[in-house]
A protein has these predicted regions:
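Conserved ABC transporter NBD signature motif
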Residues: 56-67
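ABC ATPase NBD coupling module
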Residues: 65-80, 104
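A short, proline-enriched helix->beta-strand linker immediately N-terminal to the Walker B motif
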Residues: 149-153
């Protein structure tokens, strides 16, 4: 189990993290979300032992995670960290990069393992391609495969799908998180993408200016966001009479005392997002069809 207890960290007298606590068990995934600069990447670096905590403790299975003041070589054999900058070998092949941490004493097993990982990250056909010729998204997939090559006990992911296009992102998510769950690998992931969180995270931590705003099940936080910052993470929202409503919770109806003036209709594929003015406030709601601009509509609110 990963235990993070009251961890704080300062940089140049700026409080980057303050009293952060969390627990992650084997096979579980903790998703850390928040605005840029909220401390997500810093927390991952502290967990990895890349920096020293100012106070608090980080422990994995009763083993303290020490920073560079107490440990000369950064990192641990049981933990892998995939940062936003990929530390790959550009002049070697995809297979050589993925297998770089695997033993050469068992070449048959190594070859089989590399091919398994190539399939997990969907890079079939690129095994012999040098990394320097890959796209950013393909390099990110190589970095992910290399990180899980030796089946770590815990993996740290910093925006793991940020460079990957939508054509591959959905299936790659499914493959990777299924692999982590099957092999009981704990995961701590920093992300800006709600799709990383809702379907795959067991816990969700919201950081704001270095402090934990909330930690809970993703479904619980989504159902009751409590704060505009949290609601905004999940999509368009509106504040009506002091309450937060997602766009799908505001519904067009025939008659209602709640009336708004339509400003724009944005095509979203299987629905239109309608921007409207309600008592001088801007609100957003979903509708199957576009609505005429400047028309007055009646709305109802649904939870």
């Amino acid at each position: 189990m990963l235990s993070i207890t009251n961890v704080s960290y300062k940089y140049n007298d700026r409080q980057v993290l303050k009293s952060v606590s969390a627990e992650v068990h084997s096979g579980e995934c903790l998703a850390i979300v928040g605005e840029s600069g909220s401390g997500k990447s810093t927390l991952l670096k502290l967990i990895f032992g890349q920096m020293d905590v100012d106070s608090g403790a980080i422990i994995w299975n009763n083993q303290p995670i020490l920073g560079p003041k107490n440990k000369l070589v950064v990192g641990h054999g049981f933990m892998k960290y995939v940062a936003q900058e990929f530390d790959l070998m550009p002049y070697t092949s995809v297979s050589e990069n993925i297998g770089s941490y695997l033993s050469n004493f068992y070449p048959t097993e190594k070859k089989s393992r590399v091919q398994e990982l190539v399939e997990v990250v969907e890079l079939e056909g690129f095994e012999n391609t040098k990394v320097q010729f890959l796209s950013g998204g393909q390099k990110q997939r190589v970095a992910l495969a290399r990180a899980i090559a030796k089946r770590p006990e815990i993996i740290l992911l910093d925006e793991p799908f940020s460079h990957i296009d939508n054509f591959k992102k959905q299936s790659l998510r499914r493959n990777l998180f299924a692999y982590l769950k099957k092999n009981k690998i704990a995961c701590v992931m920093a992300t800006h993408d709600k799709d990383d969180v809702l379907a795959y995270a067991d816990q969700m931590m919201v950081l704001h200016k270095g402090e934990v705003m909330r930690t809970d099940l993703p479904s619980a936080i989504y159902s009751n966001p409590e704060h505009p910052l949290i609601a905004a993470f999940f999509g368009e929202y509106s504040t009506i009479e002091g309450e937060l409503y997602y766009a799908h919770q505001i519904v067009l109806t025939d008659k209602s005392s709640l009336k708004a003036v339509v400003k724009h209709s944005f095509y979203k594929g299987n629905y239109f997002l309608i921007e409207a003015s309600l008592n001088e406030d801007v609100i957003y709601f979903k509708n199957p069809t576009a609505v005429e601009e400047n028309s007055v509509v009646s709305l109802t609110l649904k939870r």
